[in-house]
């Protein structure tokens, strides 16, 4: 798999069997736009737009609780957006400017499109991603 994200650090873990249970994209984004990752409305908008872009049907509204207030590195919003075929989850560290996002679905989706959209939405300077086909 090639990707359009410049300087992306990628790992691709492919199944050896022909049947797949699901597809999981795990992204660690660094040096994100701090205004975006610390804005609950923007994080919710990301989840809704991502669902549209990768053709996933959301199940309910995104949930965006604020967690980790006791530790500076973990303080920030978390995200869970259930989709009919699984979920989109994330955590956003305001102090480090990092975002950690997983997209898991039993329905195949365009991984590069999801990665590029996520990177652009959060304005990350650097991204490390892993893609796993689950058996």
Label the predicted regions:
Residues 1-135:
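Polybasic/polar functional segments that serve as interface/processing modules
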């Amino acid at each position: 798999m090639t990707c359009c994200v410049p300087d992306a650090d990628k790992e691709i873990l492919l199944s050896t069997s022909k049947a797949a249970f699901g597809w999981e994209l795990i992204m660690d984004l660094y040096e994100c736009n701090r205004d975006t990752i610390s804005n609950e409305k923007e994080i919710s908008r990301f989840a809704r737009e991502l669902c549209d872009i990768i053709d996933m049907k959301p199940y309910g509204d995104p949930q965006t609780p604020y967690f980790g207030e006791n530790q500076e590195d973990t303080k920030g919003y978390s995200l869970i957006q259930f989709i009919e075929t699984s979920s989109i989850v994330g955590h956003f560290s305001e102090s480090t400017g990092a975002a950690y996002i997983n997209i898991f679905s039993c329905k195949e989706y365009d991984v590069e499109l999801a990665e590029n959209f996520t990177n652009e939405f959060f304005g990350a300077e650097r991204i490390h991603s892993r893609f796993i086909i689950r058996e």
